[in-house]
Amino acid sequence: TELSGFRLTEDMTETLVIAISQSGTTTDTNRTVDLARSRGAVVISIVNRRGSDLTDRSDGVLYTSDGRDVEMSVASTKAFYAQIAAGFLLAFAIASAVGADLGDRQEFLASLRDLPTAMEVVLSRRSAARVIAENFAPAKRYWAVVGNGRNRIAAQEIRIKLSELCYKSIACDATEDKKHIDLSAEPLILVCAAGLSGSIADDVAKELAI
């Protein structure tokens, strides 16, 4: 793993490990935490499920509390984004504790508080999204999701959820790589392009012109 290859040293007494898990029972995550703690690391976990194995292994816990402790649906994207929000808040807290420049912290926190309203706007467009899905998805056997930067992370999450719900093998690539593959297919491409505008959005469109 990346940890064993680059960060796993014999003495980790000056290391803070942040473990992220929805259920707190993921075997590879918990084994990694055990290994880091055995070498002196301090562990803070971001987790949804209270009383889970991961919470017992952690020196500190930040609960996301994004609903039921036990995940009832594999398509629970809210757990993923709650973890991202918790990670940002923890990063700000750590930066403040060490006296780092927090820059536009207040602006960011205000944007975070506005997320519920933004989500309501997206959910209000479900009917339009359904029409698009019904028109295009059945006509294409091959699907792919693309994105860059922060949108690449969102693309990976979308790929996982679509694969779980639709029982399809779905690719996830960086936008600029798309023109080099799928040469024998005419795929349905879902583009994660939140926040892009102007020439950057135009460049993304050019990259996808297979």
Residue ranges and their predicted role:
Residues T1-I210:
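A SIS-like phosphosugar-recognition module
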